Swiss-Prot record:
SUPFAM superfamilies: Radical SAM enzymes
Region (Disordered): 1-29
Name of the featured protein: Lipoyl synthase
Principal EC category: transferase
Chain residues that bind [4Fe-4S] cluster 1: C80, C85, C91, S320
Similarity remark: Belongs to the radical SAM superfamily. Lipoyl synthase family.
Localization (cell): Cytoplasm
Cofactor note as given: Binds 2 [4Fe-4S] clusters per subunit. One cluster is coordinated with 3 cysteines and an exchangeable S-adenosyl-L-methionine.
InterPro entries on file: Aldolase_TIM, Elp3/MiaA/NifB-like_rSAM, LIAS_N, Lipoyl_synth, rSAM
């Protein structure tokens, strides 16, 4: 297997966006979302999914439908659903979820992600209370709170994060809270100042991919800025763990992944996740390689050699997948 499949033949039917008039308030998904990004997606031959890519479905006696009902009753959104995470059956089945605050419309158009794009709705003032009550109702020992990007807000949504963290701690003081934050680009210092009022137990922000692929995969984001976010948070909170995640399969090389891992350690990032990118649809960035389990094992071994306190590395690993277990094994929960 080569490090990159970027030379795959571009054979695919090119679809066009819906003919509906453009409405910034409407949530755009799939082609409607990705058709407007600056660097167009180059179709590639679809690769056959290898046998080691296996998704665990929810079992008949799991809490899958109970969790969905509770979320709907409390007007809450999960990234598990919005991003079409392949692990949703397993996680919901075990009674865990990653809560997505501040709505379901992102101000960015990252073409690897299945979260919808559009002009976000105003913040829901009741969301911190609803979230905290749901976490208490589910009796969760560990929760992950993430969000869409909110470039429309002067603080990027930092105060809303603080409101959610503080209310959750009031109702569930024993619950550990990990946040998976956006990059707060253009308002980083303001956001970090606000988060200092009530910092999380684990600070997570995903680098996602290698710097060479940023313009293609993360339009609107900046590699150095994302590293700075985590380093600056760590400088303010030296006893709190920082965490970041990467996808493989977008056209990067193994050495580029290792170089990002070195950059992470140079910026005091403690915990690492690496997983296989799986395209949500034919209108998202194509999978250019399926990384072999032996290569994931190599990444894991190198991570511990570099000094990461914990490395969750494998095809089906996602940033918040088994996050409680990751934090426990790293000695933080």
């Amino acid at each position: 297997m080569t490090d990159s499949a970027s030379g795959a033949s571009a054979v695919a039917n090119i679809a066009t966006p819906s003919n509906e008039p453009y409405d910034a308030t409407r949530k755009q998904k799939s082609l409607d979302k990705t058709a407007r990004i600056p660097i167009k997606i180059v179709p590639a031959e679809k690769l056959k999914k290898p046998e080691w890519i296996r998704v665990k479905a929810a079992t008949g006696n799991s809490r899958f439908y109970e969790i969905k009902d509770i979320l709907r009753a409390n007007n809450l959104v999960t990234v598990c659903e919005e991003a079409s995470c392949p692990n949703i059956g397993e996680c919901f089945g075990k009674g865990t979820a990653t809560f997505m605050i501040m709505g379901d419309k992102c101000t960015r158009r990252c073409p690897f992600c299945d979260v919808g794009h559009g002009r976000p709705d105003p913040l829901d003032a009741n969301e911190p209370e609803n979230l905290a009550k749901t976490i208490a109702q589910l009796r969760l020992n560990y929760v992950v709170i993430t969000s869409v990007d909110r470039d429309d807000l002067r603080d990027g949504g930092a105060q809303h994060y603080v409101d959610c963290i503080s209310r959750t701690r009031e109702l569930s003081p024993a619950t550990r809270i990990e946040v998976l934050v956006p990059d707060f680009r253009g308002r980083l210092e303001k956001a970090l100042d606000i988060l200092q009022a009530c910092p999380p137990d684990v600070m997570n922000h995903n680098m996602e991919t290698v710097p060479r692929l940023y313009k293609q995969a993360r339009p609107g984001a900046d590699y150095a800025h994302s590293l700075k976010l985590l380093k600056d948070f760590k400088a303010r909170n030296p006893n709190l763990p920082t965490k970041s995640g990467l996808m493989v399969g977008l056209g990067e090389t193994d050495e580029e992944i290792l170089e990002v891992m070195r950059d992470m350690r140079e910026h005091d990032i403690d915990m690492l996740t690496i997983g296989q990118y799986l395209a949500p649809s034919g209108h998202h960035l194509p999978v250019l390689r399926y990384v072999h389990p032996d290569t994931f094992k190599m990444f894991e071994e190198k991570a511990y050699e570099m000094g990461f306190t914990h490395a969750a590395v494998g095809a089906m690993v996602r940033s918040s997948y088994h996050a409680d277990q990751q934090a426990h094994e790293a000695g933080f929960a």
